[in-house]
């Protein structure tokens, strides 16, 4: 876990790798809960029997579920001290190059693209994150997340 002592410390790290998460196993139960939360019950996600004969040979996590893992995975990599709160401001360049089969393990690696001073003690950080599937040549998700830190 990398600790930035302040938003100035964070800004000084622009262009650097900030960390890599632990491996996380994707379970069918988590996929089903995500399907319930989003209303996306497509068979490739929630019907293991049908999915076994489908294009991936098993059920797969939703792309948006993989994206939704970013906060969980990024919180393992770094923290910023001296801030009152961190606000998810949005995303850039989100792609899902490869599926995430249920039962597989994923982890993320993040780099700090840049930090912009917005004034009044607020900075906006752009973090590039790649989520990889263990044993896969292609990443499951590549995204830039934008976080505002209020000091």
Swiss-Prot record:
It comes from the Bacteria. The record marks 40, 45 as: Important for catalytic activity. Residues 11-131 form the MaoC-like domain. The keyword Lyase applies. Its EC number is 4.2.1.-, 4.2.1.55, 4.2.1.119. It holds the Pfam family MaoC_dehydratas. The record marks 42 as: Transition state stabilizer. GO terms for biological process: fatty acid biosynthetic process. Substrate binds at residues 60-63, 86-89, 97-99, 124, 148. Keywords: Fatty acid metabolism, Lipid metabolism, Lyase. It catalyses: a (3R)-3-hydroxyacyl-CoA = a (2E)-enoyl-CoA + H2O; (3R)-3-hydroxybutanoyl-CoA = (2E)-butenoyl-CoA + H2O; (3R)-hydroxyhexanoyl-CoA = (2E)-hexenoyl-CoA + H2O; (3R)-3-hydroxydecanoyl-CoA = (2E)-decenoyl-CoA + H2O. GO terms for molecular function: 3-hydroxyacyl-CoA dehydratase activity; enoyl-CoA hydratase activity. Homodimer. Shows trans-enoyl-CoA hydratase/3-hydroxyacyl-CoA dehydratase activity. In vitro, can hydrate (2E)-butenoyl-CoA, (2E)-hexenoyl-CoA and (2E)-decenoyl-CoA. Belongs to the enoyl-CoA hydratase/isomerase family. PANTHER family: MAOC-LIKE DEHYDRATASE DOMAIN-CONTAINING PROTEIN. This is 3-hydroxyacyl-thioester dehydratase Z. It comes from Mycobacterium tuberculosis (strain ATCC 25618 / H37Rv). The lineage of its organism: Bacteria, Bacillati, Actinomycetota, Actinomycetes, Mycobacteriales. The gene is htdZ.
């Amino acid at each position: 876990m990398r600790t930035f002592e302040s938003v100035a410390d964070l800004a000084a790290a622009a262009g650097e790798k900030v960390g890599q998460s632990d491996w996380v196993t994707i379970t069918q139960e988590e996929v089903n809960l995500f399907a319930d939360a989003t209303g996306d019950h497509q068979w490739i996600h929630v019907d293991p029997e049908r999915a076994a004969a489908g294009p991936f040979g098993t059920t797969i996590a939703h792309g948006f579920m993989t994206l939704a893992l970013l906060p969980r995975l990024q919180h393992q990599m770094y923290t910023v001290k001296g801030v009152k709160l961190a606000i998810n401001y949005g995303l850039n360049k989100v792609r899902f190059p490869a599926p995430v089969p249920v039962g597989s393990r994923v982890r993320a690696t993040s780099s700090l693209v840049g930090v912009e001073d917005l004034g009044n003690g607020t900075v906006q950080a752009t973090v590039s994150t790649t989520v990889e599937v263990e044993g896969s040549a292609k990443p499951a998700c590549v995204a830039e997340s934008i976080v505002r830190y209020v000091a």
